[in-house]
């Protein structure tokens, strides 16, 4: 058992204990599904950024930049952050005003249509389950590489953590732990960026060295062997993907559902502005460092593990443990958000239940069922983190 595994296990125990403690404050469906609608700006920002990042940022996005697709990817990333403000102003504040428990309920009431409400719920459940699979595989890949522990054991440990956290404390626990996780991985990651760039000789030297090694790493077209054979096609892909992600960040259920928990409409808009700043910082600095890590290409095992390798080999041991624990936390954060949404959609939108206690019970049972399904899929499916994440979000349903 190495120090990284010990750090990850300790963090999982902390999250489980927090979930059990917070569960004492969960009295009804309002607490379980929308955290009592009393969340301040800091908690909403923490949950927005934490549920966005997951392992997809640290392994998928950074991996794409490392693989030579930096400029097209950066176009997409800098476009998508605008979705937060757009979504909060034109959708989020009205969502909060509706006082619905779920987004499908909002649409069902808005258009006075029970079938539409069910369709929205089914769509959310399917997309969130697939995205959850992506996160689960990312966590398993991370833990397996860092600790050497069997991949299946890793995903089982992760599943137990976010299942217990979500089932016991619901959205209230998810909000608080999301914010804790956000603080850990954002702070540690940005400090890590400074140290890694320093070891590369500073920004100017690092860029000079990596472009000597790979002259096309920062080219406008990206690596023409990575996706499409022409720069024009790659840029078109980047813009179209960026527009898709604008919609996802604006109205995607795993993002906009946070607004249902906000204290008021002002909190919704303020949170979106701060989330835009947070995601911009992370999406710029981490993939940029990922591209610079090409100077170690002979030592890095794969693109998706580039930042993980740098954390283990270029950072001080203690900071490395904190960063990797933060990456794990980001994955767990996204997973708890998805599970919370799935549970609320099943109990509140698909099933017709008037009794609050039964609604809570069915919501928790549905979370457990989805966990088992995702565990089975993750066991038989090879990890394809970025492909699954991208596939989910490039469907009309995800937006």
Placement of each model-derived feature along the sequence:
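Membrane-interfacial loop-to-helix junctions in multi-pass transporters
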Residues: 39-42, 72-74, 111-118, 147-157, ...
């Amino acid at each position: 058992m190495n120090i990284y595994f010990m750090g990850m296990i300790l963090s999982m125990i902390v999250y489980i204990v927090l979930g059990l403690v917070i569960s004492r404050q969960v009295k009804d469906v309002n607490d379980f599904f929308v955290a009592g609608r009393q969340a301040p700006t800091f908690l909403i920002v923490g949950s927005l950024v934490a549920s966005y990042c997951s392992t997809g940022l640290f392994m998928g996005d950074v991996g794409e930049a490392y693989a030579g697709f930096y400029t097209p990817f950066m176009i997409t990333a800098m476009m998508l952050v605008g979705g937060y403000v757009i979504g909060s102003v034109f959708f989020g504040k009205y969502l909060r005003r509706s006082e619905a428990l779920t987004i499908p309920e909002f649409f069902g009431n808005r258009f006075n249509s029970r079938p539409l409400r069910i369709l929205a719920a089914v769509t959310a459940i399917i997309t969130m389950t697939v995205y959850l699979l992506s996160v689960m595989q990312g966590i398993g890949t991370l833990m397996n590489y860092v600790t050497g522990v069997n991949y299946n054991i890793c995903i089982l440990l992760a599943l137990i953590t976010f299942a217990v956290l979500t089932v016991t404390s619901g959205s209230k626990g998810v909000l608080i732990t999301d914010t804790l996780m956000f603080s850990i991985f954002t702070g540690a990651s940005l400090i890590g960026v400074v140290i890694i760039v320093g070891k590369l000789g500073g920004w100017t030297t690092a860029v000079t060295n990596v472009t000597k090694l790979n002259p096309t790493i920062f080219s406008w077209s990206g690596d023409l062997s990575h996706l499409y054979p022409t720069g024009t096609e790659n840029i078109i892909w980047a813009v179209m993907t960026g527009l898709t992600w604008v919609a996802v960040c604006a109205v995607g259920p795993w993002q906009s559902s946070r607004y249902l928990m906000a204290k008021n409409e002002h909190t919704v808009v303020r949170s979106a502005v701060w989330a835009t700043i947070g995601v911009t910082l992370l999406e710029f600095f981490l993939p940029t460092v990922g591209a610079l890590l090409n100077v170690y290409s002979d030592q890095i095992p794969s693109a998706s593990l580039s930042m993980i390798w740098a954390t283990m080999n270029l950072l001080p041991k203690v900071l490395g443990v904190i960063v990797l624990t933060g990456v794990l936390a980001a994955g767990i954060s996204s997973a708890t958000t998805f599970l919370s949404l799935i549970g609320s959609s099943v109990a509140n939108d698909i099933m017709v239940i008037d009794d609050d206690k039964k609604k809570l019970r069915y919501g928790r049972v549905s979370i457990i069922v989805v966990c088992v399904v995702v565990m089975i899929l993750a066991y038989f499916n090879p990890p394809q983190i970025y492909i699954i994440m991208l596939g989910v979000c490039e469907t009309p349903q995800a937006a």
